Amino acid sequence: MDVKIIYGSDTGNTDYVIETYLLNELSVHFDNVVQVDIYNIDPNEWLSNDLFIIGIPTWYDGELQSDWDDYIEDFKKLDFKGKTFAIFGLGDQIGYGEYFVDGIGILAEVILANGGQIIGHWPTEGYTFSESKALVDENHFFGLAIDEDNEDEMTFDRVRIWVEQLGNEVKELL
């Protein structure tokens, strides 16, 4: 299965995580990996049967990154039946603990409402936050939560383990 990373990044942190960690790890488990900035997305990108990995930082008080915010109304109109997604998000669990990685949850809600399947749920254990829209249940996020502000030393291991998990989950789907 091919992988399409679709992401937005204002400050470059999401881009950094993709370039520094995610691309290398994904190439171990998947044949072809491409990345597409949501700012430049062609609507036909969604027509493939790739694994879509969504990258979304959360801004301010639980808001979407600016390019995702500009695209969200179009995103809500897409049909995701038969499509598989994984989501990773960046947030600050200390400074914005009441909105930690809310962007994951906002996009997950749309994906599920439009018929998509989300793999790659990630445990909440080890994080310190008070609330999050990204929770699939009390013990898991819809996707990988990354805190480059407070736990950047943990990003590599989290990405590595998550990508291995994605590889295993995709094998089960095929």
Task: Identify the residue ranges that each predicted region occupies.
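TIR-domain catalytic/interaction hotspot
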Residues: 40-50
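A short beta-strand-loop structural module common to alpha/beta enzyme folds
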Residues: 30-42
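Short helix-loop-beta junction
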Residues: 18-31, 109-113
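N-terminal beta1-alpha1 ligand-phosphate binding loop
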Residues: 2-25
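A generic secondary-structure micro-motif detector
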Residues: 11, 32, 96-97
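FMN-binding flavodoxin-like domain, especially the glycine-rich phosphate-binding loop
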Residues: 48-52, 56-174
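A structural signal for isolated positions on well-ordered beta-strands in alpha/beta enzyme cores
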Residues: 2-4, 34, 86, 119
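Conserved beta-strand termini and adjacent loop/short-helix elements that scaffold enzyme active sites
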Residues: 6, 36-38, 121-124
